[in-house]
Swiss-Prot record:
It is found in: Virion. The gene is MCP. It holds the Pfam family Capsid_N. Keywords: Capsid protein, Late protein, Virion. It comes from Invertebrate iridescent virus 3 (IIV-3). InterPro entries: Capsid_N, MCP_C, MCP_C_sf, VP_dsDNA_II. Belongs to the NCLDV major capsid protein family. It comes from the Viruses. GO terms for cellular component: viral capsid. The keyword Transcription does not apply. Major capsid protein that self assembles to form an icosahedral capsid. Represents around 50% of the total virion protein mass. The lineage of its organism: Viruses, Varidnaviria, Bamfordvirae, Nucleocytoviricota, Megaviricetes. This is Major capsid protein. Homotrimer.
Length: 466
């Protein structure tokens, strides 16, 4: 092999009009003055700070399955950057005496998502933002990159020791429990530039409020001997769990704070500051019955500047299968679960978005909402069936305004999800393959992510535009 520095000068001698347009050239003093070089690094300086994660210790209520409880956000740190929920899921054993012997027990998918019925952040009595398990499903599906997906699944409970079914005498989880973590995707966690200036809010009692589901809504018991009917069974504590109901332990909410210099801290509360934030609005869930009404129309009543819509049809045949957005129910075989069996398809074929009797989007195929739209406007494309989005923004994950529609100025907005043939068949028990050969039931879910403005003034947080 050989190469010579001299040959590089030949490259430099090929300069022409295109190069003069693209580059600042040494003989052009005007363009050189406004041209960077890749060989002298310019550093962006910042104020002096540090960051530290701490557990939030002041809580009210019982932090357990099926309970509502709150934790107070400390103002000892200057800026709140991120928060996450850390819990220990107990080991659960299907009683050895449980009959029939073909019973199997497992935790639901996306366990940490579905443990949450709702999370809100409140400032005194003012709710600043809220999210639920459906948003957590959608947000993670469209924003979690493949390089972090495995780690995220480990955090939220998508691990074999929890989701692989066990028979009588078998146990889910480890002795002493399994530690899981849920990143809480509220507005201040999106970027340090919109972090919550807790030190500037001395007159607000800031709380994170949790509404959690009962364990009965998260554990799934099936009879694998039933292959042509509904295999889901009701869990009896005394019969199936040895009389011991599961209970969470070591429940903690952690917060990552930035601590700044005294000079910056003094300036934090000196003036009025407006922050552009993101909020989540979820419409009431609606029954979806493809066999009797394959083209239902649902009113969607949102407000503020909506940047993206997420929607899906949830398969609710098993009440505890919260994250199933396909036409079929999961199929249990031995110690494994096929969440998307061969007969499982997207329940939605096309979707129409209507503004006051005028089509905003007319019968657009689900390939657009599940593949094309996220390809251009989202960080990732979901690897699961049934996730849909429509973005008004060029990039909905970007904090800068890049497109939105003010739903507060619209009236009579509706969405029409046209059922797929697979959904029509599965709803009557005539679907193809296991998991769709008994009646499937569905509900429609739609939510919006909108922008709003919060104002920090006089030691309190408020909304100048409600």
């Amino acid at each position: 092999m050989s190469s010579s520095i001299t040959s590089g000068f030949i490259d430099l001698a090929t300069v022409d009009e295109i190069e003069k347009y693209m580059y600042g050239l040494p003989d052009d003093g005007v363009s050189m003055a406004h041209t960077l070089t890749y060989f002298v690094r310019e550093f962006k300086k910042s104020t002096w700070f540090t960051q530290v994660p701490v557990p939030l210790s002041r809580s009210t209520g019982t932090s357990d399955f099926g309970q509502n409880w709150s934790v107070s956000i400390s103002r000892a740190g200057d800026y709140l950057l991120q928060t996450w929920l850390r819990v220990t899921i107990p080991q659960v054993t299907l009683a050895a005496t449980a009959t029939p012997a073909t019973l199997s027990l497992r935790w639901t998918r996306n366990l940490m998502h579905n443990l949450i019925r709702e999370i809100t952040i409140s400032f005194n009595d003012l709710v600043g933002s809220r999210l639920d398990n459906y948003f957590l499903d959608m947000w993670s599906a469209f924003t979690t990159p493949a390089s972090k997906r495995n780690g995220y699944d480990n955090m939220i409970g998508n691990i074999s020791t929890l989701t692989d079914p066990v028979g009588p005498g078998g146990s889910l989880g480890h002795t002493g429990g399994t530690v899981l973590n849920l990143p809480i995707s509220l507005f201040f966690t999106r970027d340090t530039g919109v972090s919550l200036p807790t030190a500037a809010l001395p007159y607000n009692e800031i709380q994170l409020n949790f509404s959690m589901r009962d364990w009965k809504d998260l554990l799934i018991l099936t009879d694998t001997a039933i292959t042509t009917g509904n295999p889901y069974q009701t869990i009896d504590v005394s019969k199936h769990l040895g009389g011991v109901a599961p209970s969470l332990s070591n429940v903690q909410v952690w917060a990552n704070y930035a601590i700044v210099s005294n000079v910056e801290r003094k300036k934090m509360g000196c003036g009025v500051r407006d922050i552009l934030i993101e909020q989540v609005q979820t419409a009431p869930r609606q029954n979806y019955t493809p066999s009797t009404n394959p083209m239902p129309s649902f009113d969607i009543r949102f407000s503020h500047a909506v940047k993206v819509l997420f929607f899906a049809v949830r398969n609710k045949t098993s009440a505890a299968e919260w994250s199933n957005y396909g036409t079929s129910s999961p199929v249990v075989s031995g110690t494994s679960v096929n969440y998307e069996p061969s007969g499982s398809f997207d329940p939605i074929a096309t979707t129409t978005l209507i503004y006051e009797n005028s089509n905003r989007l007319g019968t657009m195929g689900s390939d657009y909402y599940s593949l094309v739209s996220p390809w251009y406007h989202a960080p990732t494309i979901p690897s699961f069936i049934g996730y849909h989005m429509y973005s008004y923004s060029l990039n909905f994950f970007d904090l800068d305004p890049m497109g939105s529609t003010n739903y507060g100025k619209l009236t009579n907005v509706s969405i029409v999800p046209h059922a797929s043939d697979a959904a029509v068949k599965a709803s009557t028990g005539a679907g193809d393959g296991a998991g769709a050969n008994y009646n499937q039931s569905y509900e429609f879910i739609v939510m919006a992510v909108n922008n709003n403005i919060v104002r920090i003034s006089g030691g309190c947080l408020g909304f100048p535009v409600l």
